[in-house]
């Protein structure tokens, strides 16, 4: 498994540092994200004035499939324009089925909206470890694409790269991956400190420009995390097909009142959680572990008994390691949309099996994260567009109920220990 409004349109501006002798070649434009958008259509239009009225001419540049809320274009596009009017940019939000879900925004002059980028390289979109919900043991590397690149090489290093302005691999490389979309999910846990960066590649695999600036990720057991999260992609984060775990508003941990280290991994079944527990969870010596799992088992034909057995084993592992397990109930899914977007059938008895697992979880130390959706047979489209991954609003609801119930659980656990 995998993944404000434009009517109040204003642009956020960002710089990327580069070498002193570099000349600006790219323009970077970013706009406030529409949480319902899957992608955007971006265009540059000349705007003229006649008798005080603005008139828009045909676009000089248009990209109908911009991934997420920012774009980079070549500066030459605007520099070479010698026609009438002022060049302005507009965006509109596109939905899951390719339909427009907003009108084009009001035109904003490019001289205000665009930032010159002196490094011809992809731009890293997110920073880790800055606020609640932004610490992932399994990172997602997300970036903004550049013109002329047909694929991208993501490099992970165990020391800061020695060639920040080059295009050769670092001598400190520990992993690399090639992608055609602007993100890569790490399949391995990143414990300790690593750096990552990305460069564009042409159709022959040669470099387009240079490496992006390297970003540091720290997942240090010495930071003494009190609370961890273990689960599949519902806990890992992401949603609405195009948003990854690095898009923090699509992660319920982002809405929590307390810091967490997220040890979840997209695609996991409960047996996977059990298998990687010792290596991924124990080194961090957390006091509490929020556990959600079973969705992938049950939708693919697994039984409630198998899931419950794995969850019981996870509870035992936690207690043996001095960790208090807190189980989370699993929210409903929508099989029709899972089939439509992922071409995966769902077991016909999924609902009954979900109910069995959630019924058992409610007899344990738990938080009922499925409760906000109890009135639905299937998860509605506005809460999980793809039928599988809860979107921003649903993640907020899950975070809210965890915030409400977790202090009570902590208090009860403390009182029980005192009595003993």
Residue ranges and their predicted role:
Residues 26-36, 137-148:
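Conserved aromatic anchor
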Residues 96-116, 203-219:
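Extracellular fibronectin type III
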Residues 242-243, 249, 270-310, 331-335:
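Oxyanion-hole/transition-state-stabilizing segment in secreted/luminal serine hydrolases
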Residues 335-371:
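Substrate-gating cap/lid alpha-helix
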Residues 43-86, 156-189:
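Recognizes extended acidic, P/S/T-rich segments that occur
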Residues 273, 365, 382-420:
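Histidine-centered active-site loop/cap adjacent to the catalytic His
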Residues 206-266, 275-285:
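Serine-esterase "nucleophile elbow" of acetyl-processing enzymes
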Residues 79-99, 188-204:
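Beta-strand-rich modules
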């Amino acid at each position: 498994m995998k993944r404000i409004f434009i009517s109040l349109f204003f642009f956020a501006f960002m710089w990327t540092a580069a070498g002193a002798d570099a000349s600006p070649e790219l323009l970077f434009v970013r706009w406030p994200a529409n949480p319902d958008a899957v992608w955007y259509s971006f265009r540059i239009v000349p705007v003229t004035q006649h008798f005080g009225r603005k008139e828009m001419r045909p676009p000089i540049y248009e990209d109908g499939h911009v991934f997420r809320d920012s774009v980079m274009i070549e500066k030459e596009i605007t520099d070479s324009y010698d026609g009438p009017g002022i060049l302005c940019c507009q965006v509109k939000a596109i939905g899951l089925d390719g339909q427009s879900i907003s009108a084009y925004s009001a035109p904003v002059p490019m001289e205000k909206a665009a930032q010159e980028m002196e490094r011809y390289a992809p731009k890293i979109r997110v920073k880790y470890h800055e606020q609640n919900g932004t610490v992932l043991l399994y990172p997602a590397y997300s970036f903004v694409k550049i013109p002329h690149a047909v694929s991208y090489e993501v490099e992970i290093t165990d020391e800061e790269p020695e060639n920040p302005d080059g295009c050769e691999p670092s001598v400190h490389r520990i992993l690399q991956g090639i992608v055609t979309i602007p993100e890569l999910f790490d399949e391995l846990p990143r414990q300790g400190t690593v750096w990552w960066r990305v460069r564009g590649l042409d159709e022959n695999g040669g470099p387009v420009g240079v490496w992006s600036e390297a970003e540091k990720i720290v997942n240090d057991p010495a930071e003494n995390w009190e609370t961890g999260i273990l689960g599949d992609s519902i806990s890992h984060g992401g949603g609405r097909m195009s948003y990854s775990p690095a898009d923090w508003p699509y992660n319920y941990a982002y809405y929590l009142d307390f810091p967490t280290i997220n040890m979840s991994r997209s695609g996991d079944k409960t047996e996977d959680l059990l298998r990687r527990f010792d290596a991924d969870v124990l080194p961090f010596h957390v006091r509490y572990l929020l556990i959600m799992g079973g969705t992938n088992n049950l939708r693919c034909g697994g039984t409630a008994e198998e899931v419950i057995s794995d969850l019981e084993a996870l509870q035992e592992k936690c207690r043996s390691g001095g960790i208090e397990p807190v189980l989370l109930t699993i929210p409903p899914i929508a099989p029709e949309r899972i089939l439509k977007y992922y071409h995966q059938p769902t077991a016909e008895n999924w609902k009954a099996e979900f109910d069995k697992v959630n019924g058992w979880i409610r007899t344990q130390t738990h938080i009922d994260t499925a409760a906000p959706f109890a009135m639905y047979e299937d998860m509605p489209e506005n809460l999980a567009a793809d039928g599988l991954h809860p979107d921003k609003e649903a993640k907020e609801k899950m975070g809210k109920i965890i915030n409400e119930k977790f202090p009570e659980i902590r208090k009860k656990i403390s009182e029980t220990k005192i009595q003993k």
